[in-house]
Amino acid sequence: MKIVADENLAFTDYFFSEFGDIQHKAGRTLTHTDVQDAEALLVRSVTAVNESLIQNTALKYVGSATIGTDHLDIQALEKQGITWANAAGCNAQAVAEYVITALLHLDASLLEQQEKFTLGIVGLGNVGKRLAYMAQLLGWKVIGFDPFVQLDSIENVSFQTLLQQANAVSIHVPLTKKGEHATYHLFDEKAFAALQPNTILINSARGPVVKEAALIEDIQRTQRKVVLDVFEHEPVISEELLNMLALATPHIAGYSLEGKARGTQMIYEAFCQKFGYDINKRFETQLPACEDYFSRHDLKAVLKQKISQIYDIAQDDANIRACVKEGKVEQKAFDLLRKNYPLRREWAAHGGPQA
């Protein structure tokens, strides 16, 4: 069997080498010719899996090691009779930890604020519910908005109420453009007008959920602290926007070693189910041991002392700013940052909690 895989997928050879010939390709530039005689295609979010890519091919299975599916033309896949799978929730823990790290980087005193600090979570799916749990471990008050999901453990509120009451807002929704609850440009001029000027905004979901022009106007007006891991016009990022952000990172919020490995394992399991193979591999067997920070110490004390050792978000911010050339970060530089990213470990690898 011929298997075409994005060259940046983790542990591809470990999970798939026994099934056939794996050809590693650059995901963003994948062509119909690359996949024409392949039976399986393994991708990330940078590959648009559409009708022009998959029609008249030997493909029987497409696996995307990602939470989202907006890069997959599901209708075209099903029309062609191609089984598809994604990895919903694979890096949810990593994203939740990213958000908390960003907040503590901006204001370390949040560790002491308990319920005086209100975190508003927009989207209560795989990431949102984990973030809520982790935030409550720190004593923060959590409010959430999701038209499709209610969490018993938090206060569920309207979108407008969340915008007005939260001290920080973190976005965790898929990108949708149709329907009553479309998320495209959910954060527009009207939403920014409802936010308190000192409310922190974090987007680690999908870039176009935030209308960039409205965001720029809002920061100019309020001097709001904004953290972006995703961008509306990604992979190209303007220097104008970058200079306004409190923190910027190159779409790596979910880039933990565990998250990457878990994503590949999830599409491996779906692959095995499709082709009738036994599922007998686990990513945990491939991960090196880490220093234990948490098990013998208080959670807040560890985060106060070790947070930048567990994940140095300031370095990621510096790296993306160093890529500015002629007024912008270009696609090649952005992709290289992601390709060469030194995968961090989740808190649990250091003996810490996980949701």
From Swiss-Prot:
NAD(+) binds at residues 146, 229, 254. Substrate binds at residues 45, 66, 255. Keywords: Cytoplasm, NAD, Oxidoreductase, Pyridoxine biosynthesis. One of its GO terms (molecular function) is 4-phosphoerythronate dehydrogenase activity. The active site is at residues 206, 234, 251. It comes from the Bacteria. Pfam families: 2-Hacid_dh, 2-Hacid_dh_C, DUF3410. One of its GO terms (cellular component) is cytoplasm. Its EC number is 1.1.1.290. Pathway: Cofactor biosynthesis; pyridoxine 5'-phosphate biosynthesis; pyridoxine 5'-phosphate from D-erythrose 4-phosphate: step 2/5. GO terms for biological process: pyridoxine biosynthetic process. It catalyses: 4-phospho-D-erythronate + NAD(+) = (R)-3-hydroxy-2-oxo-4-phosphooxybutanoate + NADH + H(+). It is found in: Cytoplasm. Its main location: cytoplasm. Belongs to the D-isomer specific 2-hydroxyacid dehydrogenase family. PdxB subfamily. HAMAP family: PdxB. Homodimer. Catalyzes the oxidation of erythronate-4-phosphate to 3-hydroxy-2-oxo-4-phosphonooxybutanoate. PANTHER family: D-ISOMER SPECIFIC 2-HYDROXYACID DEHYDROGENASE CATALYTIC DOMAIN-CONTAINING PROTEIN-RELATED, D-ISOMER SPECIFIC 2-HYDROXYACID DEHYDROGENASE FAMILY PROTEIN (AFU_ORTHOLOGUE AFUA_1G13630). This is Erythronate-4-phosphate dehydrogenase. It comes from Acinetobacter baumannii (strain ATCC 17978 / DSM 105126 / CIP 53.77 / LMG 1025 / NCDC KC755 / 5377). The lineage of its organism: Bacteria, Pseudomonadati, Pseudomonadota, Gammaproteobacteria, Moraxellales.
